[in-house]
């Protein structure tokens, strides 16, 4: 199995996630076993994967431990009826929203947010004490089950997180503490097969997950070395890892390798190979690392013989279209400066 490893799949994807999805589909077309695996908790990973028609080939580390990889919604809970009929609560619907205030007699106890106007898809429920202080939040998976609850302390600081299976069993607990004004993870407890595993950091949990996941010569294809390079560096050498560099490897300041690729070049022997996008980069890196490991050039996707749907001779003059995410490293400011110079 090829595990295409990333951090998170969200509603709006970057070029890295787009490359992962394209690779997954290409592998599937050629009968190569593969899955996209993400390490961050995201209760809507299944929903977003479904938008790309890959929902059966995507899961997260949390899906793995929560026993929810193949989970499909089986029934729809009527929350409004449950609160009104079974719990005898009083509901007040918040105007111009999908939100509901919930009262136990006269006391305000819960605030629920739904993703739809029909109040079918529950997103979260906040719980309040008798002083109207928020003390707990429950977050629901897009498939309908309670995925995570957060116990809140002073100033709504997270004290404890519980992660659940679709059957309601707690499988992961995370404890937090205020360290120098920053809410910091101090302990992770994993309940697995009637045993408990203890971790001090999220990276330790991810490392344990990858050791459990990869069996029988399974291979990892790493697309996020900056975020996961330290995890991979401590991974058992028996697990082959291919790393993909989605950008140039040299710093623009002339200080050598870019900081977010240093974990790769500082741990070269940990990797089976490096994949880059151009032949020139392939040659440069091979020379730089003195051919210690293979460097492979796989060009990025492109469209040949594109048929224009418009008459290019009739296009409007003095207009430029720029397609990029609105982030600093896309050099949007440089593009704006170019336009300013053209029009002044």
Stretch-by-stretch model annotation:
Residues 1-88, 125, 147-149, 155-161:
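N-terminal subdomain of nucleotide-sugar transferases
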Residues 221-224, 233-252:
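Active-site proximal beta-strand in glycosyltransferases
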Residues 262-295:
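A short, active-site helix/loop in glycosyltransferases that binds the activated sugar's phosphate group
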Residues 311-330, 339:
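Conserved donor-binding/catalytic core segment of Leloir-type glycosyltransferases
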């Amino acid at each position: 199995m090829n595990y295409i490893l990333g951090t998170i799949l969200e509603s709006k994807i970057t070029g890295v996630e787009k490359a992962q999805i394209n690779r997954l589909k290409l592998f599937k077309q050629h009968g190569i076993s593969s899955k996209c695996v993400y390490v961050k908790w995201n209760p809507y990973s299944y929903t977003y994967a479904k938008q790309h028609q890959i929902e059966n080939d995507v899961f997260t580390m949390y899906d793995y431990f929560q026993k929810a990889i193949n989970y499909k919604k089986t029934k729809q809970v009527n929350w409004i009826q449950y609160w009104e009929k079974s719990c005898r609560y009083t509901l007040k619907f918040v105007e111009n929203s999908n939100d509901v205030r919930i009262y136990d007699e006269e006391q305000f106890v819960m605030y629920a947010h739904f993703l739809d106007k029909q109040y079918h898809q529950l997103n979260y429920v906040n719980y309040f004490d008798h002083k109207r202080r928020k003390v707990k939040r429950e977050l629901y998976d897009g498939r309908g089950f309670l995925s995570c609850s957060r116990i809140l302390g002073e100033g709504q600081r997270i004290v404890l997180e519980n992660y659940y299976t679709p059957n309601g069993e707690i499988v992961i607990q995370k404890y937090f503490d205020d360290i120098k004004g920053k809410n910091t993870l101090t302990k992770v407890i994993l309940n697995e097969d009637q045993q408990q595993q203890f971790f001090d950091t999220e990276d330790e949990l991810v490392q344990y997950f990858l050791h459990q996941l990869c069996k029988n010569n399974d291979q990892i294809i790493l697309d996020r070395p900056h975020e996961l390079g330290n995890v991979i560096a401590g991974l058992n050498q028996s697990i082959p890892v291919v790393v993909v560099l989605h950008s140039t490897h040299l710093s623009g300041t002339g200080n050598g390798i870019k900081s977010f690729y240093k974990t790769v070049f500082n741990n070269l022997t940990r990797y089976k190979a490096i994949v880059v996008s151009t032949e020139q980069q392939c040659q440069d890196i091979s020379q730089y690392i003195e051919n210690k490991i293979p460097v492979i050039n796989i060009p990025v996707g492109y469209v040949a013989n594109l048929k224009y749907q418009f008459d290019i001779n009739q296009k409007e003059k003095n207009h430029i279209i720029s397609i990029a995410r609105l982030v600093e490293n896309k050099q949007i400011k440089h593009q704006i400066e170019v336009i300013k110079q053209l029009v002044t």
